[in-house]
């Protein structure tokens, strides 16, 4: 798919053939990958063959014939799209080489094995290369390469190899492991021996064999080279039957600089059934997070993940030949007058660096690398390294292959930040001293003192400035009139259009400025879509420090409990003998529960590492086996009758024999679906899974013992806790807004959470609780007031940010007392007044002042918070699971020295949200905009029409709601500009059931909507978010993009027609709605669009540009007076859209969608339009007195 540079929308392929080609290419790629995986699954690790003495010659194919047939069939279909020649564009099978490892199993050493690399292209002479390996020589390795390619066609020739044992009577003389590199390409080639040797060294350069290329070269040198050779590690290939007799041009082992990590190559095998045989993981996450007391049980999937083009061991990218950064780092500008070794050109970069430093040292010059001198100034010391971002930091700093870097001796004693720094140091040494570009140096200066966060922000600003310059240049090119080119900045500052100020000479703070265009320095100009205007309240406030309870972690494992069970002799295979749910096992009612488990009750969420040890209390002549299984998500509990040995061994498990009596430590750290695990049983994410014990071999004994006692010792280690646990909700349906996320530097909310009178009669501990949501609704005496964020972000799903709360207490100098304001969740309970100190809180002492504010960054256990508003029928009740709670508790009762001043006013506001990030997408919420006297009995999803047309609406929605790719998840969300997030189409009008004699539709060209009478042929969509946007701002400006969806009558014999749309911006007051007329509308030279509709193309889009007749227009529809001036009818709209509707037997209905244009802007935020309870149904209050029954505060004075 390609992107349009004009509108930023996705466009499909240019024609159907291109789409078919793309689909075939994807199928071919999938078939090749499937063939490689099938081969690996069939052959195991490479090709592992056990040879039997009495067995005849054994042959192994290098590609499965069924996969060959599948790939070639798809390729033949693809070739038909661009050629008719059968032999044009064939595929070729490239075999870079096959490496064989032979391990003898005979003691005397007699006998040999003959290995042959063959091709079926010449049946009479199939052997390409052949080698006889004698068992007396021990374990040996040999490399063979065909140097040619073969056509990859159906029933065509193929590479294979044969193995045959000679001169031995042993039953199993030896075993052979073969690994190879292959590729399927449309080009043919002949490979040189040097390329084959390069692949051989890279194949050996793996954690299972060697750590670096030098080790691989040393191993080859020790086996195949003579003692007098003096070449580099750029060795030539040792291909051919005379491999052992040929003198290889490789460096002598005695003359090479030996690698410090050289070891005997060893192959380790791991499977789920034998978890004790582990291959140490070298992935970045495991390399940084492994501790000595962890037991990791994981499946080795390296062969499937790292493969490229069917390569079992992928070749690394060739390093560049320009190593100027190495010599610049040493400060070497010239090698003049420096005596260098004679074989300088044959040395590796590592050897050249060592030789250069020795040569300069002989001259009395000590070279100290710059990266060593400036190590303390490295930017990595400025980064805030946590367990959530260390992978991103390593990737941005160039660590793409941590497996090529070695662990230090004190690795397990280092913290996470120190491990990251150590990897950076090792990369710098490899890059600057050895010329190794495996982990490339980042493209920025690592010593400029800028962190990654600051650097990203600067890059974003630079890109935005460049884009702004581009837009300005494009705008100048389109303007032909020089007068129109005059910008706002060129108007003199004394002009009334620029600024009108009323100043008072005594008080500077009373200045009132009215500006035509308000500026927000924190937001980039092009991204300004919601311009809130300046705030008038500049009164100072005292900042209160939020007293957040510390997030705790345990230093070591603590005991949770001992859980006993009996292993009976009658228990059959795969029978379950114990089940222990987590984390519910931590909160049992047993008296033996430890203090550590009890302390977790004070926290809402935590990240816990579990350690499980299974003990079998049996001695003597007994046998049997148990399986200790961690069943995440309780998979084994769904169909207990189908559990068998295969399902148990496929799970994460540990086998315990009756003779062992102990399972050892079984450690795991489940996280569920979030970053933390909620400890609230009401959460669906609370149930992580269960520890289960199954019988794999029944209990047997030499005595009449019927059962033996067993017990599980459960220990925990709290890695971190999370205090705030905002609410949870099920995801809602998708419609309209994009799921990407966007950022507001500061979003003014001014949302009232509490407003009441605090009286002297309120005793200590009196608590008010407010249902709190940044997008919620304030209710007072039946009046409902939506919040600004609720109106603007009604289609967003989640938010993160720092909330700034303001507390205003209208008190005098005669009052004293203290009030605590705390933030809690549904899991928060208070039994004493001081329980509020166990949650994030602030304490307002009346002696400190009258106005206070505090900040709190609210983070849910999954890292994001839901945006929630009330439904149209009612506000959520106190037990609703979708809101946080704000508590106001009296710590010190109010004291007044005057009997007439027995109360003080208290107001708690959510002033703004800083660094607000909005993301996700949900279906539309109920509106609180221009509409009043709405329908009480109809749900908001179907309140656009009367009940008789509900089925039609459901049909329209099913046909037009956006669908998602079912093949897999989309790419992870990235932060998009504000305009990209909020520029989406929403249904504004429905038109259906018109008559043939009434086919002239007139609609206002504006973001606000007109409400037509009930039963009219045109109905507005009251769930259009632009209604709420317009009710929250005073003015709008810019262009609008319209989309018209035509619903064609499927039974019509008419194949299509032309849809005419005209923009009338003359100002004449046309009556809105459907009028009589069937003629083709003429634009008279004005803007007009004509779209052809038919069998396939039934969706049309067009843009109505702002003529800038007014700098901005009203967001509220103005009353039209036929006798008034035409200029009055254009103050709220760009004009009227006149649409000539098709005949009703061709088109059944129309959907008209509106979308903000690239320069659309809303200006000067206002209080969102409120509504009354009697028009929207019975409502519940959002403020309650904190009692067990949550008594309503209807009678509380406001």
From Swiss-Prot:
Function: Capsid proteins VP35, VP26, and VP23 form a capsid enclosing the viral positive strand RNA genome. Together they form an icosahedral capsid pseudo T=3 with a diameter of approximately 30 nm (Potential).
Top-level lineage group: Viruses
Coiled-coil spans in chain: none
GO (cellular component) term, any one: host cell plasmodesma
SUPFAM superfamilies linked: Positive stranded ssRNA viruses
Gene Ontology process terms (BP): transport of virus in host, cell to cell
PTM per Swiss-Prot/TrEMBL: Specific enzymatic cleavages in vivo by the P1 encoded 3C-like protease yield mature proteins.
Keywords: Capsid protein, Host cell junction, Transport, Viral movement protein, Virion
GTP-binding listed as a keyword: no
Protein name per UniProt: RNA2 polyprotein
């Amino acid at each position: 798919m390609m992107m349009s540079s004009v509108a930023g929308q996705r466009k499909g392929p240019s024609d159907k053939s291109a789409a078919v080609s793309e689909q075939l290419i994807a199928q071919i790629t999938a078939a090749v990958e499937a063939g490689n995986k099938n081969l690996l699954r069939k052959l195991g690790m490479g090709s592992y063959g056990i040879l039997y003495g009495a067995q005849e010659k054994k042959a192994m194919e290098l590609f499965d014939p069924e996969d060959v047939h599948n790939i070639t069939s798809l390729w033949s279909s693809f070739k038909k799209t661009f050629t008719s020649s059968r032999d044009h564009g064939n595929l070729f099978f490239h075999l870079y080489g096959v490496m064989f490892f032979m391990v003898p199993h005979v003691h005397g050493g007699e006998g040999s094995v003959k290995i042959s690399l063959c091709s079926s292209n010449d049946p009479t002479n199939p052997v390409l290369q052949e080698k006889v390996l004698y068992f007396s020589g021990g374990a040996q390795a040999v490399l063979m390469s065909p140097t040619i390619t073969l056509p990859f066609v159906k029933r065509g020739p193929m590479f294979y190899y044969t193995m045959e044992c000679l001169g031995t009577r042993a039953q199993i003389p030896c075993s052979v492991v073969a690994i190879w590199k292959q590729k399927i390409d449309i080009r043919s080639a002949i490979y040189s021996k040097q390329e084959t040797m390069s692949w051989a060294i890279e194949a050996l350069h793996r954690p299972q064999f060697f750590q670096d290329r030098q080790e691989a070269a040393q191993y080859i040198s020790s086996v195949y080279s003579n003692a007098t050779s003096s070449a580099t590690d750029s060795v030539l290939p040792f291909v051919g039957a005379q491999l052992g007799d040929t003198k290889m041009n490789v460096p002598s082992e005695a003359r090479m600089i030996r690698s410090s990590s050289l070891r005997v190559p060893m192959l380790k095998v791991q499977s789920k059934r034998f978890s004790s045989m582990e291959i140490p993981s070298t992935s970045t996450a495991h390399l940084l997070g492994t501790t000595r007391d962890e037991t990791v049980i994981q499946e080795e999937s390296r062969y499937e993940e790292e493969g490229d083009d069917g390569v079992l061991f992928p070749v690394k990218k060739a390093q560049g030949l320009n190593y100027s950064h190495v010599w610049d780092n040493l400060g070497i500008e010239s090698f003049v007058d420096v005596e260098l070794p004679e074989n300088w050109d044959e040395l590796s970069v590592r050897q050249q660096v060592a030789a250069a430093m020795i040569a300069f040292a002989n001259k009395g010059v000590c070279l100290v690398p710059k990266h060593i001198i400036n190590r303390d100034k490295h930017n990595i010391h400025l980064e805030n390294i946590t367990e959530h971002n260390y992978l991103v930091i390593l990737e941005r700093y160039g660590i793409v292959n941590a497996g090529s870097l070695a662990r230090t001796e004190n690795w397990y004693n280092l913290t996470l930040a120190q491990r990251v720094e150590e990897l950076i140091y090792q990369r710098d040494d490899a890059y600057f001293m050895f010329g190794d570009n495996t982990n490339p140096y980042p493209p920025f200066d690592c010593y400029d003192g800028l962190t990654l966060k600051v650097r990203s922000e600067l890059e974003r600003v630079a890109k935005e400035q460049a884009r702004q310059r581009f837009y300005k240049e494009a705008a100048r090119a389109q303007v032909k009139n020089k007068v129109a080119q005059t910008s706002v900045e060129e108007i003199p500052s004394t002009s009334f259009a620029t600024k009108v100020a009323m100043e008072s000479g005594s008080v500077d703070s009373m200045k009132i400025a009215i500006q035509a265009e308000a500026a927000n320095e924190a937001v980039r100009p092009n991204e300004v879509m919601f311009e809130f205007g300046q705030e008038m309240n500049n009164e100072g406030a005292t900042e209160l420090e939020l007293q957040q309870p510390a997030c705790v972690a345990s230093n070591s494992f603590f005991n949770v409990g001992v859980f006993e069970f009996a292993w009976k002799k009658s228990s059959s295979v795969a029978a379950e003998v114990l089940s222990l749910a987590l984390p519910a096992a931590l909160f049992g009612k047993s008296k033996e529960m430890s203090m550590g488990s009890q302390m977790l009750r004070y926290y809402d969420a935590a990240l816990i590492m579990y350690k499980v040890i299974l003990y079998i209390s049996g001695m003597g002549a007994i046998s049997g086996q148990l399986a200790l299984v961690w069943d995440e998500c309780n998979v084994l509990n769904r169909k207990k009758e189908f559990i068998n040995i295969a399902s148990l061994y496929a799970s994460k498990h540990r086998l315990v024999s009756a003779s062992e009596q102990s399972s050892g430590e079984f450690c795991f750290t489940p996280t569920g679906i979030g970053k933390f695990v909620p400890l609230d049983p009401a959460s669906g994410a609370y149930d992580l899974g269960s520890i289960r014990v199954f019988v794999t071999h029944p209990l047997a004994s030499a005595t009449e013992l019927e059962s033996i006692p067993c017990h599980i010792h459960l220990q925990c280690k709290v890695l971190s806790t999370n205090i705030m646990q905002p609410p949870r909700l099920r995801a809602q349906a998708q419609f309209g807004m994009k799921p990407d996320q966007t950022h507001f530097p500061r979003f003014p909310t001014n949302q009232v959470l509490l407003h009441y009178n605090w009286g002297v009669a309120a005793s200590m501990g009196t608590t008010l609780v407010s249902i709190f949501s940044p997008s919620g609704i304030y209710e007072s005496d039946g009046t409902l007031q939506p919040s600004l964020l609720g109106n603007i972000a009604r289609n967003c799903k989640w938010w993160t940010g720092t909330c700034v709360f303001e507390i205003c207490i209208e008190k005098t100098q005669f009052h004293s007392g203290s009030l605590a304001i705390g933030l809690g969740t549904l899991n928060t309970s208070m039994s004493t007044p001081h329980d509020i100190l166990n949650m994030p809180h602030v304490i307002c002492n009346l002696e400190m002042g009258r106005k206070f504010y505090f900040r709190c960054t609210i983070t849910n256990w999954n890292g994001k918070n839901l945006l929630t508003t009330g439904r149209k029928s009612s506000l959520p009740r106190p037990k609703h699971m979708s809101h946080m709670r704000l508590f106001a508790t009296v710590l010190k009762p109010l004291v007044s020295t005057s009997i007439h001043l027995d109360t003080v006013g208290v107001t708690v506001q959510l002033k703004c949200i800083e660094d607000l990030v909005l993301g996700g997408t949900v279906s539309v919420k109920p509106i609180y905009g221009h509409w009043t006297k709405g329908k009480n009995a109809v749900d908001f999803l179907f309140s656009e029409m009367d009940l008789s047309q509900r089925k039609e609406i459901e049909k329209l929605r099913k046909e037009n709601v956006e669908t998602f790719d079912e093949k897999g998840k989309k790419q992870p969300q990235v932060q998009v500009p504000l305009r990209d997030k909020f520029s989406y189409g929403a249904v504004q009008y429905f038109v259906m059931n018109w008559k043939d004699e009434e086919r002239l539709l007139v609609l206002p060209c504006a973001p606000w909507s007109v409400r037509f009478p009930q039963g009219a042929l045109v109905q507005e969509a009251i769930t259009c978010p632009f209604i709420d946007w317009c009710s929250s701002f005073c003015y709008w400006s810019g262009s609008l993009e319209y989309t018209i969806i035509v619903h064609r009558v499927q039974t019509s014999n008419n194949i299509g027609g032309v849809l005419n749309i005209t923009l009338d911006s003359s100002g004449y007051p046309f009556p809105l709605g459907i009028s009589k007329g069937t003629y083709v509308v003429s634009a008279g030279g004005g803007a007009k669009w004509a779209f052809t509709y038919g069998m396939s193309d039934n969706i049309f889009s067009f843009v109505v540009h702002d003529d800038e007749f007014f700098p901005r227009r009203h967001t509220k529809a103005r009353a039209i007076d036929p006798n008034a001036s035409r200029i009055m009818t254009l103050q709220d709209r760009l004009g009227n859209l006149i649409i000539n509707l098709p005949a009703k037997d061709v088109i059944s209905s129309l959907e008209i969608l509106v979308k903000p244009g690239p320069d659309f802007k809303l200006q000067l935020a206002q209080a969102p339009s409120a509504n009354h309870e009697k028009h929207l149904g019975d409502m519940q209050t959002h403020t309650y007195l904190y009692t067990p029954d949550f008594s309503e505060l209807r009678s509380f004075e406001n």
